[in-house]
A protein has these predicted regions:
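Glycine-rich active-site/cofactor-binding loop and its immediate structural neighborhood
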Residues: 1-26
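An extended, acidic
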Residues: 19-27, 31-226
């Protein structure tokens, strides 16, 4: 993370089903914050399937541990909060930004000059993106790269870096916290538990956000041709 902000150690454990093992088979997941050199606090979050989420904050100097409350946002809209599509790597950032802007204009057709309508946080860490939703900072994060890049390849554009299953191995924590997580086609999130498969995801803080964003986002993606 270039010492700009926290990175995350991610781990998920699943029964070994050989080549058929999938992310949905993960039964235990843990993520530990690796803070910057200027920070003395580190959060660890973990979940066991069907048993909810637990978390604690460790003070790295005193070694004191305190319970950490995990509570995704209960907001009914992304307006006024943090919500974004991941576009920290080229190519296709123009396409993703265009989709975002169209989505916002549909939600707020009568923009007030000078008003901050929505915020974005391009956190270059899938673990960091999940964390920000889990603690209530972000309301929606989407990663459409695995869906967008094959489309761009048909136009002769070289694809960029994408998310992989090991980046998403702690999504069980989000599910246990009550978040809505789908793949980038709006289907149940899942993928082979390997290191090569390209994956995408849509991470909604709650059902209200899902109902507001997904139907519109689905149509806007289709209008862009991918």
């Amino acid at each position: 993370m270039y010492d700009k902000r926290s990175a995350f150690f991610l781990a998920g454990a699943a029964p070994n089903k050989g080549n058929t093992t999938r992310l949905s088979d993960i039964e235990v997941a843990v993520m530990t914050e690796l803070p910057t050199s200027r920070s003395v606090l580190s959060d660890t979050l973990w979940a066991i399937k069907g048993q909810g989420v637990q978390a604690e904050t460790l003070h790295l100097e005193t070694l004191v541990r305190k319970p950490r409350t995990i509570k995704p946002s209960g907001a009914h809209t992304i307006i006024g909060g943090f919500a974004q599509l991941a576009r920290f790597f080229p190519p296709g950032r123009d396409v993703l930004a265009r989709i975002e802007d169209k989505l916002i204009l549909e939600l707020v057709p009568n923009l007030v000059p000078g008003r901050a309508i929505i915020f974005e946080d391009q956190y270059i860490s899938t673990g960091g993106q999940l964390y920000e939703v889990l603690v209530g900072h972000d309301r929606f994060v989407g990663d459409l790269r695995s869906r967008l890049y094959p489309y761009l390849q048909t136009k002769g554009i070289v694809p960029g870096h994408v998310c992989h299953p090991y980046d998403a191995c702690t999504f069980l924590i989000g599910q246990e916290a009550g978040c809505i997580i789908t793949d980038c086609f709006g289907e149940a999130f899942d993928a082979p538990l390997d290191v090569l498969t390209d994956v995408g995801f849509l991470l909604f803080a709650n059902q209200h956000i899902y109902q507001e964003v997904w139907p519109r986002l689905k149509r806007l993606i289709s209008e862009e041709g991918f």
